[in-house]
Swiss-Prot record:
Pathway: Lipid metabolism; fatty acid biosynthesis. GO terms for biological process: lipid A biosynthetic process. This is Acyl carrier protein. It holds the Pfam family PP-binding. Its main location: cytoplasm. The lineage of its organism: Bacteria, Pseudomonadati, Chlorobiota, Chlorobiia, Chlorobiales. It comes from Chlorobium chlorochromatii (strain CaD3).
Length: 79
């Protein structure tokens, strides 16, 4: 899977999980500040990313993933 395909899939997951429009999402968007996620939303989003990309994201890494860019970069690094 290319980085562009990963980005598109991450965007799609954010749209379905967070109920935001795709045009509201930018790579620098913060899940909590910009996309309105609370801590439970963020945990559920991380779990969905793990399932979608078949990766394990340890808690200490998940705590560092605060933006869309960080999520995409993390998944790309694990592919």
């Amino acid at each position: 899977m290319t980085a562009a395909e990963i980005k598109d899939k991450v965007f799609d997951i954010i749209v379905s999980r967070m109920g935001v429009n795709k045009d509201q999402i930018k790579m620098e968007s913060k899940f909590s500040d910009d996309l309105g996620a609370d801590s439970l939303d963020t945990v559920e989003l991380i779990m969905e990313l793990e399932n979608a990309f078949d990766v394990q994201i340890p808690d200490e890494d998940a705590e560092k993933i605060a933006t869309v860019q960080q999520a995409v970069d993390y998944i790309v690094s694990k592919q």
